[in-house]
Amino acid sequence: MTSSPDSATTSATHPAIRTDPATGAKLFATRAAKATERIAGKGYSAVSDEALKTLPPPPPGAKFDAEEQARYREFKESRRGAADYMAMEGEFARYLDDVYSAPPVEREALTDDCEVLVIGAGFGALLLWYKLRAAGFTDVRFCEKGGDVGGTWYWNRYPGIACDVEAYSYLPLLEEMGYFPSMKFASGFEILEYCQTMAERYGFYDRCLFHTTVERTEWDEAESRWTVHTDRGDAMRARFVVLANGILTTPKLARIDGMESFAGQSFHTSRWDYTVDLEGKRVGIIGTGATAVQVVPELAKIVRELYVFQRTPSTIDVRDQRATTPEEIAQWSREPGWALARRERLATISSGRTALQGNDDFLSGKVEAVKPKRRYERELTPEERIQAQLNTNFRIMEQIRARVDAVVKDPKTAAALKPYYPYGCKRPTFHDEFLPSFNLPHVTLVDTAPLGVKKITPAGVVHDGVEYPLDVLVYATGFEWMATGSFNMIVGRDGRTLREKWREGGVRTFLGLHSHGFPNLFIMSGPQGGGGQFNFTRGLEGHTDYVVWMLKTLRARGAATVDITRDAEEAYAAHCRDADILTRPLRDCLSYYNGDGNAEPGSLAYYGGPAKWHERRIAAQASLDPYVFEGTAERVAAAGE
């Protein structure tokens, strides 16, 4: 690791906790060593076969009529109730072990004070530190349960991992870092290295306590501070707490009879065990979601037999991966603001599929539009716009289903791989090698629709009376969506946790960033949070800007705390509910986006669109009406001393 400009001089022993002689601040050296050099890989490959990089045209007369709508409903209803997941506790707790780092660095427990404590060390935390530092906030501390930075890119290091948003728009601070991604769609391994370089350059490692899981955070009304308890015995006090631990952080395991009896080796994709040699082995993978779509082609290249157990097929769209060209790097080097301009152009695209394809001509500014906008004789009502989107989505899905027929040779396998739900209802996937994998003689799709795998034995997986013998079993069963465990351990003014408040009265926030009764708490990228659309890091840009703005506002007013009025929260929650209900036909399937069909409207993601979210944010910042500022910063500072 290179030293950062902020690093204090340390002794030869480089203690885990030291004091900066210039400022008196505590600095840390708790970054864990990499567990093994075998943890390495790549993402999408560039494919030369043009037939694999284009979708067939939609069939003539394709229309989302009553017959097709009934087919979609039957596809959905046949799977209702099939999603059954369990907590990773007891004998299943091992699936959460950190397999990527050496054991935690030993350190003493901390019981001191800081101004800002942030939970997480992914892009949200890295961006926030960059901006806080620039704004003059330096008494900032981070807690991260993993052994290094990266967030989702730390935990997800499976073979084939890559980002589905183009790297030129996804990676933050590209110009500041002087970095050009090697591929249009960067691999997770490259993204992790980029996170590490960011952390080194801006002194993040000195501020972060790694292998430190926050277990409980309690508000002290008398002192206007949070007390943060961790699994390392810490009881740190902070004026402000920021949740920056992401939206897909808790892995899920499907509840399957007999899974504990499996005699072979098994692991979850978010804890990929690189000590397990897969070459020449019989391997099974349960799941065909976004992760499995990236994993399967890589497994197919090395294993002896591969069994892919699928309950619900994904949409397998064209990826068309390519390397960054020397000409692009030369052009961008001469073009100040190139990355920001590209990111903002991406944000103007309203179609998720178009945004995720990343049209280079449009994003580079060579053309004014990706394609001509369709014009209607009159302005459509919101309901008519939804119906128009459904019709467009249906034609795209027809093309995606036609692609399956064009690529997969076995008709039975092809039929099982065709999805029947609105495009984007489940997370879209992109790959040019996934479908061809099922033409290989040693790769077998086991169609477990509609209810999924129900039995595992010591020898392997059983379905329809057939036992599939396995040496290794991989669970690609995904993550809980916006269900971070942090919500269970944040205790606010009335003694309730955030989870208890939301369970009793429904999810209620203001902008997704505040919740009434939890002063000086900021929730980044949580339920009802908006502003980002399809590029997650653009949302983080907005959220981090907001947190810095609020801290500067509190400092300027000399206030100790900020909370939200109950009325502002109720109005925003109602807006989130209305936006969800209006657009719900676009998500008429069972997926983690809607809690497998069980989530209350407005309780998860924000569906009002980035423009509406920013409109509400700007109005709040201009008027300050939704906020309740109390106390004086001097009193809090005295209490901290």
What is the role of each PLM region?
Residues R271:
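Flexible, glycine/small-residue-enriched loop-and-beta-strand segment within the central core
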Residues L299:
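Class I S-adenosylmethionine-dependent transferase superfamily signal
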Residues V296:
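Ligand/cofactor pocket segment of small-molecule handling proteins
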Residues T2-V116, A121, Y130-E260, T275, ...:
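N-terminal FAD-binding dinucleotide-binding subdomain shared by FAD-dependent oxidases/monooxygenases
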Residues V276-V283:
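Glycine-rich NAD(P)-binding loop of Rossmann-like domains
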